[in-house]
Amino acid sequence: MAQKIRKSTFKKDKNSSINGVVHIQSTFNNTIVTITNITGDTISWASAGSSGFKGARKGTPFAAQTAAEKAALDALSKGMKSVEVLVKGQGSGRETAIRSIEGAGFEVTSIQDITPVPHNGCRPPKRRRV
């Protein structure tokens, strides 16, 4: 019986743009960094959990820095040069994630805070007593 001859196909990179948007979602438990092009297609992403941190260490500023560097290096290798940064959430890793994006070699054009603020929506969780 004749065997099929397989052609080796490689995944073709989409036309990567030079400009992009860095979305940083920083919660108290984790930090997620997603880098997209202008139309919103994801180019690279990383989180504190995907960078090797587990448990309570995912919420630390160092974990956010590591995740941002990992996503930034991946996007830089695909040809991205300048980005605008959108930050959402009030976690401890937002400032260090922004600094590591700038330090990775991106030209940051703008930084915006898009944290959602409720207009008296859901009841917030009760205060912690330690």
UniProtKB/Swiss-Prot annotation:
GO molecular function terms attached to this record: rRNA binding; structural constituent of ribosome
N-terminal signal peptide: none
Subcellular location: Plastid, Chloroplast
InterPro entries per the UniProt record, alphabetical: Ribosomal_uS11, Ribosomal_uS11_bac-type, Ribosomal_uS11_CS, Ribosomal_uS11_sf
Taxonomic superkingdom: Eukaryota
Subunit structure: Part of the 30S ribosomal subunit.
Name assigned to this protein: Small ribosomal subunit protein uS11c
The organism's taxonomic lineage, starting at the top: Eukaryota, Sar, Stramenopiles, Ochrophyta, Bacillariophyta
